């Protein structure tokens, strides 16, 4: 079986499934098993509605507070793994997504670091 020269994984541990730490575990286990293969993080993010805040944020609560926790964890994880060849936050801006009705907003993916109108930088 031939594999590509590089691989990237689109993981959402800590948002759609599992816990944040599973991102760390996945990449560490992959790198330990295949130390000579390039691996990247092709997509990661967590939805946030800036109107939602929490003193004790939790996965799936759509709070700006949890989005900040999520990205702080991911950035620390990336910083500790210089062997990751690429990382891609999803997404710079919130964007239209007609089929979505989550986090208090219909028709919008709220994984952006900035609101859909480009006016509010989220605390991520």
Task: Report the location of each language-model feature.
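Extended substrate-binding grooves/exosites of carbohydrate-active enzymes
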Residues: 1-124
């Amino acid at each position: 079986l031939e594999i590509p020269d590089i691989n990237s994984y689109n993981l959402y541990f800590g948002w759609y499934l599992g816990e944040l730490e599973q991102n760390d575990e996945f990449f560490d286990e992959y790198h330990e098993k295949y130390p000579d293969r390039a691996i990247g993080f092709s997509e990661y993010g967590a939805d946030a509605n800036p109107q939602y805040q929490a003193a004790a944020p939790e996965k799936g609560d759509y709070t700006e507070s949890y989005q900040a926790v999520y990205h702080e964890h991911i950035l620390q994880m990336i910083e500790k793994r210089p062997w990751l060849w690429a990382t891609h936050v999803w997404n710079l801006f919130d964007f239209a997504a007609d089929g979505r009705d989550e986090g208090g907003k219909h028709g919008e993916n709220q994984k952006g670091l900035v609101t859909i109108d480009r006016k509010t930088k989220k605390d991520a």
